Design a protein with these regions (language model features):
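Flexible, active-site-proximal loop/turn residues at the rims of small-molecule/cofactor binding pockets
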Residues: 235
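Conserved helicase motor core of SF1/SF2 NTP-dependent helicases
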Residues: 77-81
Length: 235
């Protein structure tokens, strides 16, 4: 991070932590909720990602409005309340039964409703394709049509993040070449890899000849020759 801040290109290949990178974990969480939306942690992660763009305050607003419902049901109820806001009879009935702790549909509420409407419309679109679309094709469409790929590429270390996303698509394509196919099986397969600490390591974005600072362990550097070497943490 320090080298990047100073404008010095640096490169370090990680042999672990691929599934824990932000961009990969969010994409996997999105696949999880396409398979089964009633998973609170993946749903919360996706809603606060570029897919949903919800703020912590908006997440708290949903939970406050429906404190006794499971989170997925609370989000759906909040979204449906926004869709029904023009129906006076339903709004009055909701106020009478006390289903929601909300008292008005302020501008902030309407902005949140629009976010949720867009989010669930996208989910419905992709979920309809799950039965007949190979996972790697589904992933590619999700990345491209939602703007997720552009979002992660614009983040710090964007080239590395984009390479990690591309690598996930490649892994999904390779998986489709096995006897196991479909979203459910792919999500389960990744879950098993994570359970047994099987990690791919982050995707490589530079070749051996790149004009850059290469960060590596002493063990990994054996047999290599560099004109300048900094050995950090020696005492």
């Amino acid at each position: 991070a320090v080298l990047s801040e100073e404008g010095i290109p640096a490169y370090s290949v990680s042999r672990e932590g691929y599934f824990e990178t932000y961009e990969v974990s969010v994409l996997l969480d999105y696949l999880k909720i396409l398979d089964n939306a009633r998973q609170d942690l993946p749903l919360a992660a996706v809603l606060t990602s570029p897919f949903g763009n919800l703020t912590p305050a908006e997440m708290a607003e949903i939970r406050t409005a429906y404190p006794n419902l499971p989170f997925y049901e609370a989000v759906r109820a909040y979204a449906e309340e926004g869709g029904d806001s023009g129906n006076e009879g339903m709004a009055a009935g909701r106020a009478f039964t006390g289903e929601s702790g909300r008292e008005s549909d302020s501008g902030r509420d309407r902005a949140l409703w629009r976010k949720l409407e867009r989010f669930f419309d996208q989910m419905a679109h992709f979920r309809a394709k799950v039965p007949y679309t190979p996972v790697h094709e589904l992933l590619t469409e999700i990345i491209e049509t939602t703007g997720f790929g552009l979002s992660v590429a614009a983040m710090p270390a964007g080239a590395q993040r984009a390479a990690n996303v591309d690598m996930l698509v490649e892994k999904a394509s390779a998986f489709e070449g096995t006897s196991y196919k479909g979203l459910f099986n792919f999500v389960r397969y990744i879950g098993q890899l994570r359970k047994y600490d099987v990690d791919y390591g982050e995707a490589g974005v530079m070749d051996e000849q790149s004009d850059t600072v290469r960060i590596m362990s002493i063990h990994k550097s054996k047999g290599l020759e560099f004109p300048i070497v900094f050995a950090a943490g020696m005492g």
